[in-house]
Curated annotation (Swiss-Prot):
Cofactor: Zn(2+)
Keywords: Cell membrane, Membrane, Metal-binding, Transport, Zinc
Membrane topology category: Peripheral membrane protein
Main location as per UniProt: membrane
InterPro entries the UniProt entry points to: DabA
Protein name: Probable inorganic carbon transporter subunit DabA
GO cellular component: plasma membrane
Quaternary structure annotation from Swiss-Prot or TrEMBL: Forms a complex with DabB.
Family: Belongs to the inorganic carbon transporter (TC 9.A.2) DabA family.
Length: 868
């Protein structure tokens, strides 16, 4: 029997086949996929809403969830006090907004009203409760405010309170969180959810009849419930009285009730064919349970919540901000009163904060323009370059690169930290692949780390010792009997660890790190670089010759490194180092799901050293000198050190460059660490040894903020290094090298925007969302978080799965933000026609710019700046 016939028989909803699938797919736009915390990937929560403008989404979220996504008044006042907002930009923004409005009030009068309102002061409660003001509002009941009313469809459970005064939506959330934890748990418990292999809905349906948390009547509602999730969802919607035209909005409301758990469900549904309908199953479980809980209260008279316009605040705003007395108000004609009310309604809090945000962003853009203009130099005035080093575009690379260039004859480049290699990596002794590329891409090749058989056996034996200890501990912890004895057995050891880790973290950390290196010292390894035709896996192993040449050519052209090679070229991945930190993966590559970049850097450098690759590139005009050697290193962002991971046999000139880098690296680390550490809240005084302090932060397991990560990111600059060289960009800019003269077709620029540009935007808006709405898009305080089911963090044991960054990643103190919530400014160094072509050809990017999700500026070959 088809779903269509079941729906027609059991419900009043006349749907087409697969309509439920389409509605769920459309509704899912309001949530973003949430990666597990162990493979934390930057994402922004509004990625599915970019067809609407930022302003529209802000108004919509304020209406349906009461979530503000503009900076608060406190943030704005703080930024203005620091000189981050110029008043002139605010005034010009206000003038443009007033020009766009239609009103019949003297311009001077509305300007005076707006100027005072833009101080962002709250209306006094004494004024709002004043009898005269409330009487005025009552007497104006004849004013037509229908055009100003809002109505939104809310989940039925959110409209009902039980006899205990509990909102039924809170009770529903409690149940759903419980079932999500049971189904999604991959590592937390030894007893998994029965029938889990049959899917979320079927497993839930099997157990719900035994759930003691439900009443007998609630279980009775679900007793003979449909076996199919789609049918169950349609039936529940029908019995709740949701009309077909309102279904998508209703589903969106439920997805936004727990956006973290729903986001994790959505991510899981994208990972395998077996779980591709998991989001439908989630909604079937949730709305079926909603029906069971709310059944005694049905039917409701009205499921749409009408938000009538409050007249009192509108009148009070004109009295307080417009300097109109109650007597003057009474003497006005009704038409004028109505006009004033409508204007006050339009110039609401969102508009006021929007104007401040835009002024803040314009001030930042102007300050960046001046900084770049003051440092521009002739591109032909170049010093002798001893080594060239390519770093990830990550904002944390910028200070390190700046100090490196100051202290030695080096040239640095910015490139996406996976170096254009779409690979899944398999480290020595591992049977699992880990995608080592941005999460917006899928791996096309599998690269295995290899060594000889004897070395491999020895290494695997050493690994098994550590694995068996961890496995034994986990088994004892999860076993009913042994878990009671475990605290007594392990207490002394963990007590000693706690004391030493807290009071001598650097020394203990170094000891443990050295012990681990000794025990798990890798032998010399190679890679499976050559293509294997017959492979059992879905992803082919290695590269063909053409693929090797293509990936190297593509990366070198992307950064404009096709001539004038230095004797030593170093590909620098990056990684982080912290202890007792659930968000450790978030401090790795923000794009690559917690993957460090060292593996890719080593693979790329190895490819560049292959004679067959160099010969093919030389035939195309990219001639790499014979004495130029490619090496690989890893930039440790928490301690600002460079760790060599691949140094082949060096030529004489390359050895000189290598020795020079080694000699200045301690100074580079000291300068970079000092600059970075002084930004932390606990370091306002002079630091004697910055590198030692950085290591202490990395090893101290009580440290809640080992580094700032990518906080304060604000711009993505695409251009030659000369554009920003010697500029102190304060670790706020993503830097990607680009030479427009080598990109006649514009394809390289298009690829940078589609790949690294998208990733930078995701990172930027994740930090933005976690700052402006931490209660909804952040993850609260690290010190009170609970790591749940190996998936993510919760506050306590019954909260949403928290989707964003913790308080410590964006806040300097309880009252002071560290991250400046600005939308990403993309600056492209290229002629105007290149930008026009990009916008004409890339509809998605043009939409982001037009709808206010990113900002765009360009610098032409003559150094002229243009805001788009």
């Amino acid at each position: 029997m088809s779903i269509l016939s079941i729906l027609k028989k059991d419900t009043n909803i006349d749907m087409q086949e697969n309509n439920i699938n389409d509605l769920v797919a459309s509704a899912s736009r309001v949530i973003a996929p949430l990666w597990p915390i162990s493979t934390f990937a930057a994402h922004h929560p509004w990625m599915g809403l970019e067809k609407q403008s930022f302003e529209q989404v802000a108004d919509w979220l304020k209406e349906i969830r009461n979530v503000d996504i503009y900076p608060s008044a406190a943030m704005i006042h703080s930024a203005k006090a620091k000189g981050e907002i110029e008043e002139s930009f605010l005034q010009s923004g206000l003038s443009r907004w007033l020009d766009s409005q239609s009103f019949h009030i003297p311009r001077k009068k509305v300007e005076q009203f707006c100027q005072v309102a833009l101080k962002l002061e709250e209306l006094p409660s004494s004024l709002l409760s004043l009898p005269e003001v409330n009487k005025l509002a009552e007497e104006m009941s004849y004013i037509n405010t229908e055009s100003m009313k809002d109505s939104s469809l809310q989940p039925v459970s959110s409209l009902i309170e039980n006899q205990k005064g509990e909102n039924l939506s809170d009770i529903l959330n409690y149940h759903i969180i419980k079932w999500c934890k049971l189904y999604l748990d991959d590592s937390g418990s030894s007893w998994t959810m029965p029938n889990r292999e049959k899917g979320f809905y079927r497993a839930w349906q099997h157990l719900i009849k035994f759930d003691p948390a439900l009443s007998k009547n609630e279980r009775k509602v679900l007793k003979d419930w449909p076996q199919d999730a789609q049918v169950a969802l349609a039936r529940a919607l029908s019995e709740l009285g949701i009309s077909e035209s309102n279904i998508q909005a209703y589903l969106e409301g439920h997805l936004l009730s727990l956006p973290g758990w729903a986001g994790m469900i959505r991510w899981r549904s994208q990972q395998s064919i077996q779980e591709q309908e998991l989001l439908i199953e989630y909604l079937a479980v949730r709305i079926s349970m909603e029906l069971a809980i709310t059944k005694p209260y049905l039917p409701l008279k009205n499921q749409k919540v009408e938000k009538k316009v409050a007249i009192v605040p509108l009148i009070a705003s004109w009295i307080y901000w417009g300097n109109i007395s109650t007597r003057e108000w009474l003497q006005m004609p009704a038409a004028e009163q109505s006009e004033l009310l409508v204007f006050a309604y339009r110039f609401d809090e969102n508009i006021r904060r929007k104007l401040w945000l835009e002024a803040w962003e314009q001030t930042h853009a102007e300050q960046l323009r001046k900084k770049i203009a003051s440092k521009q130099r002739a591109t032909n005035d170049k010093k002798r370059v001893l080594a060239q080093l390519a770093f990830c575009i990550d904002v944390r690379s910028e200070p390190f690169r700046r100090h490196l260039e100051k202290l030695g004859p080096f040239e640095t480049f910015g490139i996406a930290g996976f170096f254009g290699l779409p690979i899944a990596t398999s480290e020595l002794g591992s049977n699992n692949n880990h995608p080592s590329l941005p999460v917006i891409l899928k791996p096309k090749h599998q690269i295995k780390e290899l060594t000889n058989e004897n070395e491999l056996k020895s290494y695997e034996q050493r690994k098994r010792v550590g694995s068996s200890v961890r496995y034994t501990f986990k088994t004892m912890k999860q076993n009913v009997l042994t878990s009671m004895a475990l605290p007594e057995l392990s207490g002394p050891l963990f007590g000693l660890q706690m004391v030493t880790r807290s009071f001598v973290p650097r020394g203990v950390g170094a000891f443990i790190r050295n012990l681990r290196k000794t025990m798990l010292q890798k032998p010399d390894t190679t890679f499976s670089l050559n293509h294997v035709h017959d492979t059992k896996g879905e992803i082919p192993i290695g590269f063909t010759k053409e693929e090797k040449v293509n990936y190297v050519r593509q990366a070198l052209k992307m950064v404009g490194l096709t001539e004038k090679f230095a004797p030593l070229v170093v590909m620098c991945g990056h990684s982080s180092q912290s202890t007792n930190n659930p968000y450790a993966a978030a401090l790795e590559c923000g794009a690559c799901g917690g993957a460090a970049g060292g593996f890719n850097a080593r693979v790329f450098a190895t490819l560049c050293n292959l004679p067959e690759v160099r010969e093919a590139l030389a035939a195309e005009g990219i001639k790499i000198p014979e004495d130029t050697i490619f090496a690989a290193a890893e930039h440790k962002t928490t301690v600002d050190e460079l760790e060599w991971i691949y140094v082949p046999e060096l030529s004489e000139a390359a050895q000189e460059a290598f020795d020079c880098i080694e000699s200045i690296m301690p100074n580079v680390s000291q300068h970079a660490n000092r600059e970075r550490l002084t930004q932390l809240p606990n370091f306002k005084t002079k630091i004697k040894n910055a590198s030692k302090e950085a290591h202490r932060f990395a090893e101290d397991w009580s440290e809640i903020r080992p580094e700032w990560g990518l906080a304060r990111n604000a711009s993505f600059i695409i251009g030659q290094r000369e554009l920003t060289q010697d500029c102190d960009l304060e670790g706020r800019a993503f830097l990607h090298n680009y030479d427009w003269k080598q990109d006649e077709s514009g394809d390289i620029l298009a690829n940078i925007i589609a790949g690294p540009g998208t990733v930078a935007q995701w990172i930027n808006l994740q930090y933005y969302a976690s700052t402006v709405a931490p209660h909804y898009y952040g993850s609260g305080n690290k010190t009170t978080q609970t790591v749940t089911a190996g998936l993510g963090v919760m506050q306590g044991n019954a909260s949403d799965l928290l989707p964003g960054l913790p308080w410590q990643s964006v806040m300097q103190s309880d009252s002071e933000t560290y991250h400046s919530p600005l939308r990403l400014l993309i600056v492209i160094q290229a002629p105007i026609e290149y930008i026009e072509r990009l916008l004409n050809n890339d509809f998605t990017f043009r939409e982001k710019v037009q709808n206010g999700w990113v900002r765009l500026a360009s610098v032409d070959p003559e150094g002229r700046w243009k805001n788009w």
